[in-house]
């Protein structure tokens, strides 16, 4: 009784302190973020950013896979950027592992050609505040009299 192995990959996306982890497996094209469909992502203005990989690559590439995404940390915008990165990385990893190298290369080229941050994390972090001023670089005004 040989059971078919579950074809799945797990990828993460990061932006500032937000982390999104995507579990990608064979399925019917469901994409859920913290248990809710991707079409109901809030805030509505940033919804297109979350579905960007799907719009770029076409829905047909996502019909054979189910994605479950858990996201935590950061703010609204950072979470959306972490989600889109983890979706893109998970699809590339799934195609590399279970489909073929040619399809994976096509997907990767499309994504990198549009926006490199879909596959590569943004290393910028908030600079810590220093003494003698209100922020990291701003100084208190100097008075001569």
Curated annotation (Swiss-Prot):
The keyword Cytoplasm applies. Its main location: cytoplasm. Keywords: Cytoplasm, Ribonucleoprotein, Ribosomal protein. InterPro entries: Ribosomal_Su5_D2-typ_SF, Ribosomal_uS9, Ribosomal_uS9_CS, Ribsml_uS5_D2-typ_fold_subgr. It holds the Pfam family Ribosomal_S9. GO terms for cellular component: cytosolic small ribosomal subunit. The keyword Cytoplasm applies. GO terms for biological process: maturation of SSU-rRNA from tricistronic rRNA transcript (SSU-rRNA, 5.8S rRNA, LSU-rRNA); translation. GO terms for molecular function: RNA binding; structural constituent of ribosome. It is found in: Cytoplasm. Belongs to the universal ribosomal protein uS9 family. PANTHER family: RIBOSOMAL PROTEIN S9, SMALL RIBOSOMAL SUBUNIT PROTEIN US9. This is Small ribosomal subunit protein uS9. It comes from Gossypium hirsutum.
């Amino acid at each position: 009784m040989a059971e078919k192995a579950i074809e799945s990959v797990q990828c993460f996306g990061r932006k500032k302190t937000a982390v999104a982890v995507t579990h990608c497996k064979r399925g019917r094209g469901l994409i859920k973020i913290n248990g809710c469909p991707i079409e109901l992502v809030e805030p509505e203005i940033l919804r297109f950013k979350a579905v960007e990989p799907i719009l770029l690559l076409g829905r047909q590439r996502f019909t054979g896979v189910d994605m479950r995404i858990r996201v935590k940390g950061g703010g609204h915008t950072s979470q959306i950027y972490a989600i889109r990165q983890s979706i893109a990385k998970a699809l590339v990893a799934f195609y590399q592992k279970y489909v073929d190298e040619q399809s994976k290369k096509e997907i990767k080229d499309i994504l990198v050609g549009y926006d490199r941050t879909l596959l590569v994390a943004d290393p910028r972090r908030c600079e810590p505040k220093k003494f003698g001023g209100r922020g990291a670089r701003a100084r208190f005004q100097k008075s001569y009299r």
